[in-house]
Amino acid sequence: MVVSSVCVFSGTSFTGSDFLPQAVNNKLDEMASDGSLQEIIDEYVRLGFNNIFLRSLNPYGFAKQYKEKIAYPIDEFIANYKEGLDYIIELNKQGTFFIEGFAALLLKRMLTPFATGFVDLQSPAGVGIAGAIYDYDGSVYVSDEARMMARFKNFYFKLGNVNENSYEEMFNGELLHNIIASSCTECLPGCSECVFQPYCGADPVRNMSEQGDMVGFRPTNEMCKKTKAIMHYLFELLKKHDPEINRIFWSWIK
C-alpha cells in the first residue's frame, strides 16, 4: 500500500501514520515532544512523502480522557501551524513539492466552486450523509469519531445496528434528521453572519464531545477559532499577490 498523506498533532502531542515503521514513528514522536515541527516535516520529505496534514488534538477517546496531561492551548497550535505552513511554502519555493493537507482543503473551498469531500467542512454536516462507520458488531455510527465516543459509553451518534434496524430506520430516522437540522451553517448562531461561512462547515459530533450539544457555542469553540485563524492567514497570504505563493497554492488544489 502506498501512503502519500500522513497526519500529525503538532505541539505537545503527535500521532504518526500507522503505515510507517515503528522506528520512524518513535523518531517522530521524540521530535514532536520537543516541538520540532520543521524537523518532522523534513523527515517526511526525506522519507519520500509529499503531503502532511497538521492537526490539533481532537476531543475523542484517550485524547479526551487524558486531556489534562497532553492538551495544549489552541493558540499555541495556531502559532505552530502558521510556522509549519510558512516552512512548507519555503520548501515548495526551493523546488520540493509538498502539500499541507488542511490548507489545501480550505484553499479548494476558497478558490474554486468545487467540494472537497472533507466531512468536517460541510453544511449540513457530512456525518451520516457523506459517510458512515460500520463497526465489527454491526453497529452503525455517523462517523469514526462517533464510534470513538461509543468506546467511552457515549452512544448518542449511533444510528442503529444492521442486525436489528433497517436501512430506512437508520438513514431516514429522527437522529439523522436532527443532525442535519442542527448543522446548517447558514442558520447556526455565530456561523450565519460569519465572513468565512461559505468556506466552512459544521461538526456536530465534535461540538457534542467538546461542548455538550450539537450546535456548540462559537465564542469558546476551539475548532471554530482554529479554522477561522487559518482561513484568515491564508487570505493574508493571497493578498500579498506573490506569484510564487499563488503558484504553490494552485498546485496543491489542481
Locations of regions flagged by a protein language model:
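Radical SAM enzyme [4Fe-4S]-AdoMet core and its adjacent flexible, acidic
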Residues: V2-V8, T15, L20, K27-D137, ...
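Flexible mid-to-C-terminal extensions adjoining Fe-S/redox cofactors in radical SAM and related proteins
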Residues: A150-K254
